[in-house]
């Protein structure tokens, strides 16, 4: 999984 993508989702959630 992509790290920046995970961080992006974390920001939304």
UniProtKB/Swiss-Prot annotation:
GO biological process assignments: defense response to bacterium; defense response to fungus; hemolysis in another organism; innate immune response
Coiled coil: none
Leucine amide, modified sites: 13
One GO location term (cellular component): extracellular region
Molecular function terms, GO-annotated: lipid binding
Tissue: Expressed by the skin glands.
Localization terms from the record: Secreted; Target cell membrane
Top-level taxon of origin: Eukaryota
Keywords: Amidation, Amphibian defense peptide, Antibiotic, Antimicrobial, Cytolysis, Hemolysis, Immunity, Innate immunity, Lipid-binding, Membrane, Secreted, Target cell membrane, Target membrane
Main location per the UniProt record: secreted
Subunit and interaction comment: Adopts monomeric helical conformations when bound to bacterial (anionic) and eukaryotic (zwitterionic) model membranes. May also oligomerize as homo-dimers or -trimers in Gram-negative bacteria mimetic membranes, and from homo-dimers to -pentamers in Gram-positive bacteria mimetic membranes. Adopts an antiparallel dimeric helical structure when complexed with LPS micelles. This dimeric helical structure may interact with the lipid A domain of LPS.
Similarity section: Belongs to the frog skin active peptide (FSAP) family. Temporin subfamily.
Job of this protein: Amphipathic alpha-helical antimicrobial peptide with potent activity against both Gram-negative and Gram-positive bacteria, and against fungi. Mainly acts by causing perturbation of bilayer integrity of both neutral and negatively charged membranes, probably by forming pore-like openings. Also displays anti-leishmania activity by damaging parasite membrane. Shows hemolytic activity. Also shows cytotoxicity against cancer cell lines. Strongly binds to lipopolysaccharides (LPS) and its lipid A portion.
Descriptive protein name: Temporin-1Tl
């Amino acid at each position: 999984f992509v790290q920046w993508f995970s961080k992006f989702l974390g920001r939304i959630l």
